[in-house]
């Protein structure tokens, strides 16, 4: 038996496609939504001005209840003040509520899309690699996706950026995760065969601005790399073919040199169309 667990606060643009890419390969899907961000603030110092922090443009609860009617899908509210071990906590919640436990659990984000049959391949790979507790995938990060385009764009592969994480429950005494679904021991075991699409740079412009402002606030709280405040205006909203240095971190913009043309393979396109 396999479960999938999602967490979502914003970004409903691609969650239907994401769920459709895995629903035939899992027994249950738990979608946990939060109405509050990890870090709450009423105002934010942004571009040398103090502004009101915007309201989440997505009514996530309403969207989920309207679009997901399958008996496989369970929708729950969950609020927290840190993403640290969030997936581990979410698994504990559903495991305590269900008598029958799965052999595998998949931790997913709402902007991640598997290719057709790719989750089955990932499951087989983890099964055969008996020494691993979990396995993750690298990501093809699509830049400003447009369904009408034959050619879309992507950024170069970021080799240490983990995608969805599949855990083998019988090999794990307790699931402890970092901010993502990867193990808190920081070791990432990447699949040799499977990559997924990440659509996180392709949300609508209102959601992208909200995501950007959350990153500005959250980076200050956790002491992460300072966010380039002009990224949204100059790099994303105002992007064209000549735009370079796309990383959001101030001082590290060159880590993503530029976006380049990319024809999305059919195994992913079956869910995007």
Where are the predicted features?
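Short, well-formed alpha-helical segments that are part of the catalytic scaffolds
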Residues: 11-44
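Short beta->alpha connector loops
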Residues: 8-14, 172-173
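Short amphipathic alpha-helical segments and helix-helix/interface helices
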Residues: 16-20, 61-65, 95, 122-127
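Short hydrophobic beta-strand elements that form part
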Residues: 3-6, 31
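Catalytic-site signature of metal-activated, phosphate-bearing donor transferases
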Residues: 83-95, 103, 111-273
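Active-site-proximal specificity loops/subdomain of glycosyltransferases
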Residues: 2, 34-104
């Amino acid at each position: 038996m396999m479960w999938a667990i999602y967490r979502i606060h914003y970004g409903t643009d691609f969650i239907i496609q994401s769920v459709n890419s895995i629903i035939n390969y899992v027994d249950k899907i738990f979608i946990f939504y939060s109405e509050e961000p990890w870090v709450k603030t009423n105002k934010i110092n942004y571009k040398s001005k103090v502004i009101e922090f915007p309201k989440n443009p997505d009514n996530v609860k309403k969207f989920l209840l309207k679009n997901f009617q399958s008996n496989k899908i369970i929708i729950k509210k969950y609020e927290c003040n840190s993403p640290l071990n969030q997936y581990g906590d979410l698994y504990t919640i559903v495991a305590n509520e269900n008598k029958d436990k799965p052999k595998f659990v998949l931790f997913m984000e709402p902007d991640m899309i598997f290719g057709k049959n790719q989750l089955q391949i990932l499951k087989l790979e983890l099964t055969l690699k008996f020494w691993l507790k979990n396995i993750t995938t690298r990501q093809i990060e699509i830049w400003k996706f447009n369904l009408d385009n034959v050619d879309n764009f992507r950024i170069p592969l970021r080799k240490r950026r983990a995608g969805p994480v599949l855990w083998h429950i019988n090999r794990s005494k307790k699931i402890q995760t970092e901010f993502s679904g990867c193990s808190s021991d920081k070791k990432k075991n990447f699949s040799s065969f499977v990559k997924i699409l990440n659509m996180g740079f392709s949300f609508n412009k209102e959601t992208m601005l909200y995501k950007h402002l959350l990153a500005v606030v959250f980076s200050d709280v956790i002491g992460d790399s300072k966010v380039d405040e002009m990224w949204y205006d100059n790099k994303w909203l105002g992007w064209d073919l000549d735009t370079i240095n796309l990383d959001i971190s101030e001082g590290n913009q060159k880590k993503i040199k530029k976006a380049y043309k990319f024809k999305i393979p059919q195994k992913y396109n079956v869910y995007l169309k």
